[in-house]
């Protein structure tokens, strides 16, 4: 309403020149012919009934206060709309002279564009600030404000913006693709690293397990190759008698193959005839000789049943079954011939009646039985007629040195003496090396390995192939010593090959060496004798030197300088004395 009043007031106070200009501007859009018809002269007269809302020519010269309509009848002087009007207001604005153009009569039809420009400039001059702000807000609009204006479709800025957006979009796509590729690569490398770490862990565990198994096999191989199976056992005075009793024992058992009957392999008549009267050298305990095994397998003599008593009667007593199939030849597995006697002697060395077999071992080596040579009986007999045989340092060292051998005689003297002492007159010593039941234990290095009986299982293929002899082949590393075609050199070659393999493995990796004993803790024979001399009981003769020497021999160790004993063992033994 305020805009309407302002326009209405401008219309009321236009000068005649301004009115002509306004009419010319309004009639410039019409053709000249129509303009002449439409142009009317303004009525100078006043019509009291004209109102500002009616298009009358007389309304330009009359004031709204003198309007004849009844619309303003109730208005007084205080309520007049012209109270705020400034009479000193200048209607002429700077630059208004440039807006006057040619009259409509002098303009031709070709000047249509010029009039349009004048109209446009005139209208732009009359636009207020509000419309200018609206035009600024709509400047980005491509369509023109007037219907005759064509929209701008090809603007360089819009093209650049579109290109920038497309380039940014492509860059983002490439960046996202690159990031996805990197993530996939990292994930793949992570999986490969995890698998490699897992495989390395498994390989390390397997290598450790193989190293443990290799150490165990090296220990077993060292026992077999060095022949130290009985060295530690025979160092005890009582054990020497026991092991010599095993060598003097006439009991021998050859394990036959499961499912086979005794045949020509066990009983070789020709071999028995050639080896029957043959004398061999003194056997070394713990070592089996091929000729002795052949002689033992070929001998045939009469035997007594396991339940009979010792008898010198040359009559043959052989176990006979109900159908009479077994003969006296089958007893050759358990007995052997005494070549020193002129005739066959039936000696009953069975487990139930033999006194030699009772030396701390039963018939099968599993349960102890009462023995004639028990520790109590031996102790009584030794103390009843005891005489001291050591009278000085030299004899003491000689007695103590019997625990070890030398270059000329590698067998300890204690072992030889125990062998000669255990030969009884009822059973004269034989020159043949007849293996007892301990030769099976010697093959395994003198140790009972429970793994052989716990972990080993008979393969199922043996049930179909009737081959049940694989257990003994796996349990004992040595081949069949009882076969005539056996050659002992094969065992040596096999051991050498294994040793060479171990040497090659030692060259590749550092071998774990068990730390040895401290040499400073080992006392020689001279130091032990000096210590005994400092004891008052020894000077008074209250100490049994023979018994003390035998106890020291049990703890003695062989070294390059002679026999040595650990200081702790010496303190323990002397403290008990």
From Swiss-Prot:
Residues 525-558 are annotated as: c-CRD. The keyword Lipoprotein does not apply. Residues 154-217 form the bZIP domain. It is found in: Nucleus; Cytoplasm. Residues 182-189 are annotated as: Leucine-zipper. Residues 109-121, 133-144 have a biased composition (Basic and acidic residues). It holds the Pfam family PAP1. Residues 347-364 have a biased composition (Low complexity). Disruption phenotype: Decreases the level of cutinase cut4 during oxidative stress. One of its GO terms (molecular function) is RNA polymerase II cis-regulatory region sequence-specific DNA binding. Residues 159-180 are annotated as: Basic motif. Its main location: nucleus. Residues 25-178, 294-386 are annotated as: Disordered. Transcription activator involved in oxidative stress response, specifically during hyphal growth. Regulates the transcription of genes encoding antioxidant enzymes and components of the cellular thiol-reducing pathways including the mycelium-specific catalase catB (but not the conidia-specific catalase catA), thioredoxin reductase trxB and thioredoxin thiO. Preferentially binds to promoters with the core binding site 5'-TTA[CG]TAA-3'. Activity of the transcription factor is controlled through oxidation of specific cysteine residues resulting in the alteration of its subcellular location. This is AP-1-like transcription factor napA. It comes from Emericella nidulans (strain FGSC A4 / ATCC 38163 / CBS 112.46 / NRRL 194 / M139) (Aspergillus nidulans).
């Amino acid at each position: 309403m305020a805009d309407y009043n302002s326009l209405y007031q401008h219309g009321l106070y236009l000068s005649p020149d301004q009115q002509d200009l306004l009419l010319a501007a309004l009639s410039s859009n019409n053709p000249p012919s129509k303009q002449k018809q439409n142009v009317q002269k303004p009525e100078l007269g006043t019509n009291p009934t004209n109102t500002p809302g009616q298009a009358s020519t007389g309304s330009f010269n009359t004031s709204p206060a003198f309007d004849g309509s009844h619309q303003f009848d109730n208005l007084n002087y205080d309520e007049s709309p012209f109270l705020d009007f400034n009479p000193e207001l200048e209607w002429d604005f700077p630059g208004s002279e440039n807006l006057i153009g040619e009259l409509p009569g002098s303009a031709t039809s070709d000047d249509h564009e010029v009039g349009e420009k004048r109209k446009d400039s005139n209208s732009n001059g009359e636009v207020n600030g509000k419309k200018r702000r609206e035009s600024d807000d709509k400047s980005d609009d491509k369509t023109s404000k007037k219907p005759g204006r064509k929209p701008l479709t090809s603007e360089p800025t819009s093209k650049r913006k579109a290109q920038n957006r497309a380039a940014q979009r492509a860059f983002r796509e490439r960046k996202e693709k690159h990031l996805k590729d990197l993530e996939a690569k990292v994930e793949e490398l992570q999986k490969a690293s995890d698998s490699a770490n897992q495989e390395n862990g498994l390989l390390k565990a397997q290598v450790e397990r193989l190293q443990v198994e290799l150490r165990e096999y090296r220990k077993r191989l060292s026992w077999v190759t060095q022949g130290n199976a009985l060295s530690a056992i025979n160092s005890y005075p009582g054990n020497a008698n026991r092991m010599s009793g095993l060598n003097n024992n006439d009991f021998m058992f050859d394990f036959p193959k499961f499912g086979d009957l005794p045949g020509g392999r066990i009983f070789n008549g020709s071999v028995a005839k050639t080896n029957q009267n043959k004398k061999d050298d003194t056997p070394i305990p713990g070592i089996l000789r091929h000729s002795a095994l052949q002689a033992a397998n070929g001998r045939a003599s009469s035997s007594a049943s396991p339940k009979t008593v010792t008898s010198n009667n040359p009559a043959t007593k052989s176990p006979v079954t109900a159908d009479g199939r077994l003969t006296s030849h089958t007893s050759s597995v358990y007995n052997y011939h005494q070549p020193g006697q002129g005739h066959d002697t039936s000696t009953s060395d069975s487990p139930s009646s033999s006194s030699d077999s009772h030396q701390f071992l039963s018939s099968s080596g599993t349960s102890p039985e009462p023995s004639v040579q028990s520790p109590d009986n031996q102790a009584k007999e030794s103390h009843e007629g005891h005489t001291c045989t050591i009278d000085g340092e030299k004899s003491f060292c000689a007695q103590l040195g019997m625990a070890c051998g030398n270059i000329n005689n590698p067998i300890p003297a204690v072992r030889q003496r125990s062998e000669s002492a255990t030969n009884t007159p009822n059973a004269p010593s034989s020159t043949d090396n007849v293996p007892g039941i301990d030769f099976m234990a010697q093959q395994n290095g003198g140790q009972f390995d429970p793994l052989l009986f716990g972990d080993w299982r008979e393969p199922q293929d043996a049930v179909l192939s009737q081959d049940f002899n694989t257990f003994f082949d796996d349990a004992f590393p040595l081949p069949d010593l009882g076969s005539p075609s056996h050659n002992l050199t094969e065992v040596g070659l096999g051991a050498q090959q294994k040793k060479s393999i171990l040497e090659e493995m030692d060259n590749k990796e550092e071998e774990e060496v068990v730390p040895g004993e401290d040499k400073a803790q080992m006392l020689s024979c001279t130091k032990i004798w000096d210590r005994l001399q400092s004891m008052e009981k020894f000077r008074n003769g209250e100490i049994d030197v023979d018994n003390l020497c035998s106890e020291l021999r049990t703890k003695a160790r062989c070294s390059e300088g002679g026999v040595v004993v650990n200081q702790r063992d010496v303190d323990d033994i002397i403290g008990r004395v």
